[in-house]
Amino acid sequence: MVLERGPGFDAYGTELPPIEGARVRAVTADARLVRQIQACLEGAPDYFARTEGGPPGTDAAARLLADAEGDDLRRVYALVPLAGGPAVGVLDVYLHHPEPGVAHVALLLFREACQGLGYGKETTAALEDALVRCGFRTLRLSVGVENPEARAFWERIGFAEVGRLDRGVAVFEKKLA
């Protein structure tokens, strides 16, 4: 079966509905949001020190968007407060990865000043809701051994380790309703 494709649709004909919680919404990232996304990346120096060994490059946001641009199964979002103001975080998710019906969170990151405020739990719940409405069955992600805080976060909101990759990377999964 060949599915019609248009703007916002992927190779499977999937267009995600809005991802919006009580306080924050996901806005599809484009060139207009590069500065805000870069500020979010730079606003999480501890994450980059642990995972990359240093701060993000000055063009990290532009590279993130360029990498995602050619992949119709990938979505990058700026996480923006409903009350207004600059982005507080970034969401990078692959649809139908590694197989149909599975989505993979490549990055959920918030400025350090915005961590611990419940935005991560709220954003994940909104993402799960959008995915379920599109027929996804599973949400998956990977966490490196150098990031125990992220591991604890994902476990707190119902994700379970289902496997290991090279270099101590744990794969987590949550079955969606």
Label each region the model flagged.
Residues V2-Q115, T124-A126, A130, C134, ...:
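Acetyl-CoA-dependent GNAT
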